[in-house]
From Swiss-Prot:
<dbReference type="GO" id="GO:0009267">
    <property type="term" value="P:cellular response to starvation"/>
</dbReference>
<dbReference type="GO" id="GO:0001162">
    <property type="term" value="F:RNA polymerase II intronic transcription regulatory region sequence-specific DNA binding"/>
</dbReference>
<dbReference type="GO" id="GO:0001228">
    <property type="term" value="F:DNA-binding transcription activator activity, RNA polymerase II-specific"/>
</dbReference>
<keyword id="KW-0238">DNA-binding</keyword>
<keyword id="KW-0539">Nucleus</keyword>
<feature type="compositionally biased region" description="Low complexity">
    <location>
        <begin position="340"/>
        <end position="352"/>
    </location>
</feature>
<feature type="region of interest" description="Disordered">
    <location>
        <begin position="1"/>
        <end position="23"/>
    </location>
</feature>
<feature type="compositionally biased region" description="Polar residues">
    <location>
        <begin position="1"/>
        <end position="10"/>
    </location>
</feature>
<keyword id="KW-0963">Cytoplasm</keyword>
<dbReference type="GO" id="GO:0005829">
    <property type="term" value="C:cytosol"/>
</dbReference>
<feature type="region of interest" description="Disordered">
    <location>
        <begin position="323"/>
        <end position="372"/>
    </location>
</feature>
<dbReference type="GO" id="GO:0000978">
    <property type="term" value="F:RNA polymerase II cis-regulatory region sequence-specific DNA binding"/>
</dbReference>
<dbReference type="GO" id="GO:0003700">
    <property type="term" value="F:DNA-binding transcription factor activity"/>
</dbReference>
<feature type="DNA-binding region" description="Zn(2)-C6 fungal-type">
    <location>
        <begin position="292"/>
        <end position="318"/>
    </location>
</feature>
<keyword id="KW-0804">Transcription</keyword>
<dbReference type="GO" id="GO:0030643">
    <property type="term" value="P:intracellular phosphate ion homeostasis"/>
</dbReference>
<keyword id="KW-0597">Phosphoprotein</keyword>
């Protein structure tokens, strides 16, 4: 029964050469073709060759196979459509489990296009195949038959088929490329209907690396071979095979058709290499310092040659325009030119004076020019004695005073706001740059003409109070000052809204705030600039009430991001309408000339010097009971302070805080009097903010502080050197730490 079915299938193929079996369904559901399907066919066609003698066919099954099946050409083998040619090897897939009781398995051998090729002897070539069982629509690998074409023995079957990666390589070990196979065919005179540069990665190759057509294979005599079974043709792709680096360029692609193509040597002649540039490359001429008229008009570079290359190409005249002579003498330079003819004499006189001074100053700086200057300025008498003219002596002697007076007259104007002046308007919205920064330039030199501090100040801004602190100490330690009170009225944060009223006597503070000194240009020298506050008029009849009046203490915004330096009266319990400045006996070592006897009658007597330390009338009555040299800490109203909530978090917040004064112990705790400042922050923040404020703003400066004081040194050492002498230098002994 089995033989009849097989023979009927073979008879159908013999009767109808165009008989095709049913197409194999795609196991993976690809729309065009199966990549694995084409990959296997590619290697199968590399293995199949025509044997020398004998007809061989694949065995049916170990249980049904015999030597008669192999010797008989009609026993389960695919017949060659061309009877004149020798038989060839066919590949038929069988069911590995044998025939089932329900009927025979459907065999779907892989598409193998047989092709006549050269006589190649090979042995033990493993041919993998796939089969499909009736109960499943998917393909599974079957057994592998080892065929020896030189023997009539039945092939050996292996139970474990090799994987696709173990498929045998082609007989020739040399790597093959599509273009090589194509040119081999063309050299042999074989026609081909494929483009070697248009092959897909799964294109078919004949034995020995020769390419063949998917649609029709040709023998050497031109007789076509029919395909054993139908298989989908792979689509044509224009991408080079595998995207290799050695793939041919698009310029090398050929339109291959059924017509005969010239051999490889002819193709190589057609491909012409680009010719090398002949001739010498002209060197660029050096660029001219002054271009010709045409190049100047076109705003182009010009070479030194005349005519230049651009003029030669444009066929124009190459002309150099005459240059304008540079003015000589006193009019040399644009800053000496004046359009008004009436000022020519003035400009000539001024320029001559400047040129004389410049030459003298330059010769004074250059020691090598002393002898020349001396020889040119003196005259030799008949006896060989040098005689200096009186004009030269007067000019040399008067040179330095003229420079000083001229510089002082330029920098100072009468009835102007003195440097570091205190703005009485507490609600002035002037920016910090116009108040504090404008008084000092980047080199540490006062804009009013004072001597430099020989130190560069850092950037001063709201977010860098350290720079403001250094600026504060630079002002205090100005040179050539008998009594420099700049610390007493300076603005701690550089803003006009914060004043320090506590360290000056009433008379000095009133004179400084209300009476601006009048400068006399003839008597002011550069080194006396810092002493402007000493030239004040005594006004003993000024009302002390007006000087120490506290303005309306209301919260407002100085700008969009910081609060003003004022608080509401409601935040100050027990505060009178007119606050007083509480002085401190312990500060007398810093200002020995300040004493309580200097203070005239005031609404509230003052005894200590602490900036912005407000005191109520009730506290003034108890002032007599307060011991002298008490450890009184400073108190201040700050709009913001920098503190650390944790080791990784640094905050800058608006706040109002102060250190509470220690007036005694009561029940083991701190006693707060009515006159003390109210701490507006929680106790957890008060310690950090108070200590940070002392580090940043130096609220109790002493003579031990240095002008180059660095706040970072304090942070490293963890101490603050400006504590009171009765207190320790460590923050651990702070009143809040007790």
């Amino acid at each position: 029964m089995q033989k009849k079915v097989v023979q009927s299938a073979s008879k159908n193929e013999e009767l109808d050469p165009h008989y095709k079996r049913s197409s194999v369904p795609f196991p993976y559901g690809l729309p065009d073709y199966d990549a694995e399907y084409q990959f296997i066919n590619h290697h199968m066609q590399q293995l199949l060759t025509r044997p020398v003698e004998g007809t061989h066919s694949a065995s049916v099954h170990p249980s049904t196979s015999s030597t008669s099946h192999i010797s008989s050409p009609s026993a389960f083998s695919v017949q060659n459509p061309n009877p004149n040619d020798a038989p060839f090897v066919g590949n038929i897939g069988l069911d590995a489990s044998g025939f089932s009781s329900g009927g025979m398995s459907e065999y779907y051998p892989r598409s193998v296009s047989m092709q006549q090729s050269q006589d190649v002897h090979f042995q033990n070539t493993e041919i993998p195949y796939y089969h499909r069982s009736p109960s499943s629509d998917s393909f599974s690998p079957g057994v592998v038959a080892s065929v020896n074409p030189n023997s009539n023995n039945s092939p050996t079957f292996y139970s474990n088929p090799p994987a696709l990666s173990n498929i045998p390589i082609p007989l020739n070990n040399s790597p093959y490329r599509p273009e090589d196979a194509y040119f081999q065919l063309q050299g042999a005179g074989v026609k081909a209907d494929i483009n070697p540069y248009n092959l897909s990665p799964y294109s078919q190759y004949g034995p020995e690396g020769t390419a063949y057509s998917n649609a029709q294979a040709h023998h050497q005599d031109g007789a076509p071979l029919q395909r054993v079974c139908s298989a989908p043709d792979p689509p044509k792709t224009s991408m080079p095979p595998f995207g290799s680096a050695g793939s041919p360029s698009p310029n090398r692609s050929l339109n291959v058709s059924n017509n005969t193509t010239p051999p490889l040597s002819t193709v190589n002649k057609i491909i012409k290499k680009p010719k090398a540039t002949t001739g010498k490359v002209k060197k660029r001429l050096p660029q001219a310092k002054r271009a010709c008229a045409k190049c100047q008009k076109d705003n182009k570079k010009c070479d030194d040659a005349r005519p230049c290359q651009r003029c030669i190409k444009a066929k124009t005249d190459c002309i150099d325009l005459p240059r304008k002579k540079r003015p000589t003498g006193v009019r040399r330079g644009p800053y000496k030119k004046l359009s008004d003819t009436s000022n020519n004499t003035k400009s000539t006189t001024a320029s001559s004076g400047h040129s004389t001074q410049d030459s003298l100053s330059s010769k004074m700086l250059d020691p090598s020019s002393d002898n020349q200057f001396a020889m040119s300025s003196r005259q030799m008498d008949e006896n060989g004695m040098a005689q200096y003219p009186s004009s030269a002596i007067k000019q040399e002697l008067n040179l330095q005073p003229q420079i000083l007076v001229s510089s002082a007259s330029k920098n100072f104007q009468p009835n102007v706001t003195p440097p570091f002046a205190v703005h009485h308007d507490h609600f002035n919205s002037t920016s910090m740059d116009g108040v504090a920064v404008s008084n000092m330039d980047e080199t540490g030199t006062s804009s009013a003409g004072s001597k430099p501090f020989n130190r560069k100040s850092r950037n001063r801004s709201f977010t860098n109070p350290v720079g403001m602190t250094e600026e504060h100490f630079l002002r205090e330690y100005a040179q050539h000052s008998v009594a420099n009170p700049s610390l007493l009225i300076h603005q701690i944060h550089g803003l006009p809204s914060e004043q320090v009223h506590g360290l000056l006597s009433h008379t000095e503070l009133g004179n400084a705030m209300h009476n601006q000194p009048t400068y006399n240009e003839s008597s002011i020298a550069a080194e006396n600039v810092n002493n402007w506050m000493l030239e004040t008029n005594d006004h003993e009849n000024l009302s002390m009430q007006s000087h120490f009046e506290v303005p309306d203490l209301k919260m407002n915004h100085h700008d969009s991001s910081f609060f003003d330096r004022h608080i509401d009266q409601t935040a100050m319990p027990g505060q009178n309408q007119h606050g007083t400045v509480k002085n401190m006996e312990t500060m007398h070592h810093f200002y020995p000339d300040v004493h309580n006897s200097e203070f005239p009658a005031a609404p509230n007597p003052v005894k200590s010097q602490v900036p912005y330390y407000y005191q109520s009338q009730a506290a003034d009555d108890e002032e007599e009971d307060v011991p002298d040299h008490q450890p009184s800490w400073r108190g201040r109203i700050h709009s913001f302070s920098i503190a650390t909530d944790s080791s990784q978090h640094v905050v800058e917040r608006p706040c109002i805080h102060s250190l509470r004064g220690i007036h005694g112990q009561q029940d083991g705790g701190l006693e707060q009097h009515d006159g003390d400042h109210v701490n507006m922050l929680p106790d957890t923040h008060a310690e950090e903010l108070a200590y940070t404020s002392m580090l940043l703003f130096h609220d109790i400066p002493t003579r031990d502080i240095r002008p180059d004081f660095n706040v970072h040194e304090l942070v490293d050492h963890g101490t603050y050197p400006n504590f009171h002498q009765n207190q320790a230098d460590s923050f651990k002994n702070h009143p809040f730490r007790q």
